[in-house]
Amino acid sequence: MTEVYDFDRSSWDTKGSLAPILPTTYPDGRLIPQVRVIDPGLGDRKDECFMYIFLLGIIEDNDDLGPPIGRSFGSLPLGVGRTAARPEELLKEATLLDIVVRRTASVKEQLVFYNNTPLHVLTPWRKVLTNGSVFSANQVCNAVNLIPLDTAQRFRVVYMSITRLSDDGCYRIPRGMFDFRCKNALAFNILVTIQVEGDFCSNRGNLSMFKDQQATFMVHIGNFSRKKNQAYSADYCKLKIEKMGLVFALGGIGGTSLHIRCTGKMSKTLNAQLGFKKILCYPLMEINEDLNRMLWRLECKIVRIQAVLQPSVPQEFRIYNDVIISDDQGLFKIL
């Protein structure tokens, strides 16, 4: 049995929205570079120079003989760096980068990025830019099938999204808890409904994910479990959730991210599951990459958040990560 409880609007009203990046052009039709700054935190970190940078741009032919042919809209996550440079300075240098893009494959299709331009204000992000980086193509590219192999490609930066990391302490991305299951436990999930504004019809993707310009995604927080082989009631778990004093915000980690901060009391078991951290970050790039790509530069805001309590999936249930499912005859060999 699934039980659903609504959080009060005050838990996300302050920072539960993201401003759009509205395209503007020069007289010749070229896009004017823009930077967006997001601060999903409470501002209690003493040093405010830490930030996460996410680049958006166009993957196009690297051909000096004529106007470049744009192949697809893409992104390049640079990660966390520390700098006192102004956002405009960071954007200016990013637009001057010579970022080469190459299409390849491993378990999934991938895109390789590396920069050939000397760095100045972007030096804190040299690990990704200078040493090169490889990402899952579906996470960073709208249409990887349109990227050719016989023509050199470059990534031309058009937009920059900066997320200030102003919360005191570190951010926990609880990957290790996603597959944790326990007998007689109740799984605590969060269902987020967002309202999307803007010209999302121009984005490549599955528009059916929006109903009345709204979309939902769910994240797993942890499990409520007792030491003895007994289960908590849903009403008791609701009281525990209310005592946690959860505050929600939207950030720009990996494109769009959900930030959750516990301002109250957390149960010892759940606290241990989360590594004794009370600031959680869920990048939509890892949770729902299709929705994340649709939201890259659109305006979105939280309109509803619900706590979802469900029985934890039994331990005997197997998790299948591929389409082979089960091959008892030994006809498929996984290398």
From Swiss-Prot:
InterPro entries: Matrix_C, Matrix_N, Matrix_Paramyxo_C, Matrix_Paramyxo_N. One of its GO terms (molecular function) is structural constituent of virion. The keyword Repressor does not apply. It comes from Phocine distemper virus (PDV). This is Matrix protein. It is found in: Virion. It comes from the Viruses. One of its GO terms (biological process) is virion assembly.
